[in-house]
Design a protein with these regions (language model features):
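N-terminal pre-ligand scaffold of iron-sulfur
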Residues: 2-106, 110-116, 162-165
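C-terminal catalytic domain of Rieske-type non-heme iron oxygenases
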Residues: 3-11, 94, 99, 105, ...
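N-terminal short leaders/motifs
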Residues: 22-51, 112-125, 157-162, 191, ...
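Flexible, active-site-adjacent loop/turn segments at secondary-structure boundaries
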Residues: 46-47, 66, 72, 137, ...
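A structural signal for well-ordered alpha-helical scaffolds and beta->alpha junctions
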Residues: 50-54, 156, 182, 214
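Intrinsically disordered, low-complexity boundary segments flanking structured domains
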Residues: 52-58, 150, 159-161, 189-195
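Rieske [2Fe-2S] iron-sulfur-binding domain
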Residues: 74-176, 180-187
Length: 270
């Protein structure tokens, strides 16, 4: 660690303010330093591909709130998105009451997925035996129910997951027995997220990249050391290389890389 480097910070319970982050970044730019750890950490290679570790991580993720999509992705009643999250097929729907609900995307008869992709629908019908569910997850119809028997009624609604909408984002917990307590999980970070007004953003779409190791991909977003070498024509001309502000907040972290336009803030009174 450089003598002038600032160690990574552990929050005392309060979020780093914008002015505090800016002051720290300006100091790093002037002194050619960055936030770093207090010790050297070597990540074991097996952490990137060990299946048992991956399964344990997915189990943990399923018990915690995760941002599934922006609110603008479900603009009207019947809007839905169906995709996998942490290894589970999820169906998120905005109901006629405006409330967003999350379900396991699996028919309660034989487990076929009842929806794919995204769109707008009043009901979801299983492509195997045509069991039909409403946007509230309730079983609405069973083909040839007289011959099938009334046993299919009552407890055959789609399995619901805890779901919460706030700050223009839709959160879900992939464990029916858990709670989606966003404020308890994110604390002050939720207020910071709400200030971004994501509800006013326009949803364009999503792209799924198959085959990538998600940890390797994520690593690239946790450091700015590679900007000059890997992005000499795009990011590097506009962003300071290897200058970072880091703040730990409970199990969460805030990471920021300054664009060179940050210099304009020097002329603005604090």
């Amino acid at each position: 660690m450089s003598p002038k480097s600032t160690p990574a910070n552990a929050s005392d319970g309060s979020l780093l303010t914008d002015s505090q982050a800016i002051e720290r970044i300006f100091q790093h730019i002037d002194e050619r330093t960055t936030d770093v750890g207090t010790t050297v950490w070597r990540e074991p290679v097996e952490h990137y591909f060990d299946q048992a570790r991956f399964d344990a991580e997915c189990a943990l993720i399923r018990r915690l709130p995760s941002a599934f999509c922006p609110s603008s992705a479900l603009p009207e009643a019947g809007s839905y998105i169906a995709r996998s999250a942490a290894g589970r097929p999820l169906l998120v729907v905005r109901g006629v009451d405006g409330k967003v609900r999350a379900f396991l995307n699996a028919c309660r008869h034989r487990g076929m997925q009842v929806a794919a992709g995204s769109g707008c629908a009043r009901a979801f019908s299983c492509p195997y035996h045509a069991w039909t569910y409403g946007g509230d997850g309730r079983l609405r119809g069973v083909a040839d129910v007289v011959k099938f028997g009334e046993d299919c009624r009552g407890d055959r609604d789609l399995i619901a997951f805890p779901c919460h909408e706030e700050g223009g984002l839709i959160f879900a917990v992939l464990d029916p027995a858990s709670e989606c307590d966003i404020r308890g999980f994110l604390g002050e970070m939720m207020s910071d997220i709400a200030e971004k007004h994501f509800e006013d953003w326009y949803y364009v779409g999503q792209r799924v990249i198959h085959g990538a190791n998600w940890k390797v991909a994520l690593d690239g977003y946790l450091e700015g050391y590679h900007f000059q070498a890997a992005h000499p024509e795009t990011i590097a001309p506009r962003t300071y290389t290897n200058v970072m502000a880091f703040e730990a907040y409970g199990p969460h972290m805030l990471v920021g890389y300054p664009a060179k336009t940050i210099e304009k803030l020097k002329d603005i009174p604090k």
